[in-house]
């Protein structure tokens, strides 16, 4: 009986020690999908983008960034065809005022595929932003696909950066995402 009690005590102490020791095995990167309603006063148009936070398992490197795909300059040309594009990194204070639709936890490998995809969009030559066919929704959709989500692009949502993530949430009920009005 005393031996059994000691074994139990040792197991409890080992479990406690393991729980208190920092481990990179607990590291993770979370990718949150955000939208912004737009503001005429702030000269901001509706937009969707991703926020990435966490720590890589294999290196311990901290991840704290956000990516959105947008036109380099907003002019009437955006209404008539492709224009030059960029990956835009929002200021932290701006991110806190946006709608967070849902979050995925991804592996280091998936994060790196997302990073490579973002770099490909950032470095694509020519006029790559198209309001109706290759916009912020297209970019965020590609990141969502890399995260394993089912994604589609209904034409009636291609200019609705808040409604589109709600649509993606309905295609992926495992997210348990709330609809943002």
Regions found by a protein language model. Name each.
Residues 85-130:
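Mid-length scaffold segments of soluble, non-membrane domains
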Residues 2-13:
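Bacterial N-terminal signal peptides that target proteins for export
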Residues 29, 37, 115-181:
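Activation targets extended, charge/polar-rich intrinsically disordered C-terminal tails
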Residues 4-6, 26, 72:
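Serine/threonine-rich, low-complexity intrinsically disordered segments
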Residues 28-100:
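Glycine-rich catalytic cores of cysteine/serine-nucleophile enzymes that process amide/ester linkages
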């Amino acid at each position: 009986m005393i031996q059994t009690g000691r074994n139990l005590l040792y197991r409890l102490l080992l479990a406690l020690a393991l729980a208190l020791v920092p481990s990179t095995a607990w590291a993770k990167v979370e990718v949150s999908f955000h939208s912004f309603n737009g503001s005429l006063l702030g000269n901001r148009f509706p937009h969707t983008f991703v926020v990435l936070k966490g720590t890589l398992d294999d290196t311990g490197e901290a991840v704290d960034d956000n990516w959105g795909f947008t036109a380099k300059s907003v002019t009437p040309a955006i209404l008539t065809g492709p224009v030059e594009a960029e990956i835009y990194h929002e200021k932290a204070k701006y991110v806190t005022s946006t709608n967070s639709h849902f979050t995925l936890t991804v592996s280091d490998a998936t994060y790196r595929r997302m990073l490579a995809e973002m770099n490909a969009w950032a470095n694509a030559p020519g006029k790559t932003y198209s309001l109706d066919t290759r916009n912020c929704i297209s970019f965020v959709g590609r990141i969502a696909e890399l995260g394993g989500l089912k994604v589609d692009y209904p034409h009636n949502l291609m200019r609705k950066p808040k409604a589109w993530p709600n649509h993606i949430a309905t295609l992926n009920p495992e997210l348990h995402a709330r609809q943002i009005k």
